[in-house]
Amino acid sequence: MPMTALADVFTKSVRTVALSTPIAVAGLMAAAVPVSAQSVLKVVPHADLRNIDPIWTTAYITRNHGYLVFDTLFALDENLEVQPQMAAGHEVSEDGLTYTITLRDELAFHDGSDVTAEDVVASIERWGARDGMGQKLMRVTESLEAKDEKTVVLTLSEPYGLVLQSLGKISSNVPFIMPKRLAETDPNTQIEEVIGSGPFRFVEDEWQPGNQVVYEKFEEYVPRDEPASYAAGGKVANVDRVEWRYIPDAATASQALLAGEVDYYEQPVVDLLPMIQSDPAINVETVDPLGTQGVIRFNFKYPPFDDKKARQAAMWAVQQADYMYSIIGDPQYFEEFCGAYFMCGGPYETDIGSEALREKDIEKAKALLEESGYDGREVLILDPTDIPVAHGQSLVTAQALRDIGMNVRLVAMDWATMTSRRAVRDAPEDGGWNIFPTWWLAADQLNPITNISVAASGDSAWFGWPENQKIEDLRNAFARETDAEKQKAIVEELQAELYDFVPYIPTGQYYQPTAFRDNVKGVLEAPVPFFWNISVE
Amino acid sequence: MYVYILRRLLATIPIMGLVAVFVFMLLHLSPGDPAVIIAGDFANEEQVDKIREALGLNDPLHVQFGRWLIDLLQGDMGESIYSGMPVTELIGQRVEPTLMLTLCTMVIAISLAIPLGVIAAWKVGTWIDRAVMTLAVFGFSVPVFVIGYLLILGGSRTLGWFPVQGYTSIFESIPGFLSHITLPALTLGAVYMALIARMTRATMLEVLNEDYVRTAYAKGLATRKVLVKHALKNAMVPISTTIGLGVALLIGGVVVTESVFAIPGLGRLTVDAVLRTDYPVIQGVILVFSFTYVLLNLLIDLTYVLFDPRIRY
């Protein structure tokens, strides 16, 4: 029997079973009616949506969910300039201390209530309690008040150059605007309801953690007139439903895209791209033009990396190409070399001081290590084997350090365990660590304030807890400076100090491709996957 | 017999109690702090501590255990640390796919493996026997995910008969259900089928050498009758034990199969929860799994009566 005939027999027998079963027929009819009338974008997201509160967690998946449901006061455009989004406009007083922000008309929440200045104030305050940049803004904020229904007044205690950059922050935590009743939730407790004023509505009934998340077009949303550009401009929902279907297995997700079961695969594995690209109906594009930065972080509390010379030795012992070939492989998706701590292609790109990273010099590294007084003690590198990007960085670092004579032990674990272990401040032999690998999206690394891996405020700094007053002074000077050219000069001075101090090794800049079928039109180029502007044919 | 069943059911209580204590201790003593994971990269120690406090993780272990146990006795398994959804609701969402996958797998596996095992024993030493045993070795040795990928490649991509992934509830659409469940059930069934076929063959071989089988043949009974009515019935006790024990194997395979075919079942829920140290969810699913396993063992013990009238409870 030919295969098609066999398939027919199968289909027919299946149909017979179905038609003889009233429940199935009723089910089929019920399912057919709404779906046929709707346009649906089926997406395989990079992770499962576990938390619905984008202020409570910094997880990128929750941030992406946030952008569908919530709106922001200001937003970053593709020129990396901050534009008004929910704000109609703003005025700054002559002394630069008072910002008066007016809200657009026709802003409404998904529960039907209007967006008011009070909602904005409560939302900014909650975000300011959690987010690093928000906390900095709150420190210089004298008052934040709702002057009337549509006007918010922010008064500063001292000049601050990053007010709009903070309120228009594009990555986690994004200052999303929620109704006051939700924004009054303790910042350390998750909100219990998802009500935003964004272009899509969260369909709570259809949310199945570990499986699917569904968003429906919010008909009352009024987009801005400007064309969409990064997070700014008109957020026009061109599909009725966006369905996130979490498929944990990369091979299965690729096959589902090839079979047309899904339309958009956010982060396909580079190894499987040749298979996906073999189908001409699938586009593979680097949607995020800014990319991602690999990071090798030291623990500054314990030898040997409490000594600057040991960190410099490590930097001379490695080169970015080794990392990139190990974790990405295809040179089409990474920069040959990027010496900028604040990303290549960003507004603060410079390669000042990056010689150690550009060239590998084992002899120099050995000499520096000796100068540091390294006594042969064991160096613990945390190795999250379930995340290829992190695992590859650990392996490359371990080999490079062994090459210069360090006694290295890789400690294999899963990512969740690593995120707990890196917070441990005890000595490496007592459950602590010396080195851990991670990565940051460029959107987080673009300037000295959002790039928390350069912060050097000691115990209150990011894991590893480096302390360097000069770096902190330069970061504060950058935040206070309102002149863009002067900010650039500060960054150059800062980067020279960073290469001397080595808070971490930037292991390279790489780009994550996204794959989507050719029935998907209007995918925006942006550091965050946005789902407005997209239509499905 | 009813007294026996009641006694066995009562015996599950201390067993479940032990499982509960063991699971709780194991989870809380293993590394991984959900508060740190939730707090993310930007949080300071004070914030992490506040989250820990909000989740009740700062209390001494026995207090946490007591709280969990009291809630559990009232039918409340707590809430997921991450999604905030009740564990009972999460498990409820996931029971059907896993139950259906396991049932379909058992139906396919048992209905294929027992006849294959019987035929292999009947035709022992011939090419039929060797072919069945080769298949069994293949099913047993090839990892579940490889079989899954091969079936996706063949059944979905090349022939286009079945969808690559996902699940449709049987209550929503029977054709949808059947098309979604076939490949996963075959995948998961491979190892199970191999196990049952080998066991059936081995026990049948033993039984076929018994005197009463020879007598049956001597009486002039048809081969089919001898094999099915006389030999197989007596071979069923060890076979049903294998079927029961094999369910443990299935539970392990379910996790992989559900991941490969993106089926939102209990296996995936367990893996996701373990990777994030979502304590209440892990505790909940392990309790459900062990309870099912204990019940299943009881069920298997009861089926012995059907096959061997000498057994009395």
Name each model feature, range by range.
Chain A
Residues P223-M275, N407:
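Ligand-site clamp/hinge motif
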Residues V44-E94, E125, I195, P506:
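N-terminal lobe/hinge region of extracytoplasmic solute-binding protein
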Residues F200, Y333-E371, T385-G392:
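Structural transition elements
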Residues F305-G346, G392-Q393, L498-P506:
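Periplasmic-binding protein-like
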Residues T102, K136-A183, N188-Q208:
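Surface-exposed binding/hinge segments that line
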Residues A356-E359, R409-A423, P448-D518, E537:
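Extracytoplasmic/peripheral linker and loop segments enriched in polar/acidic and small residues
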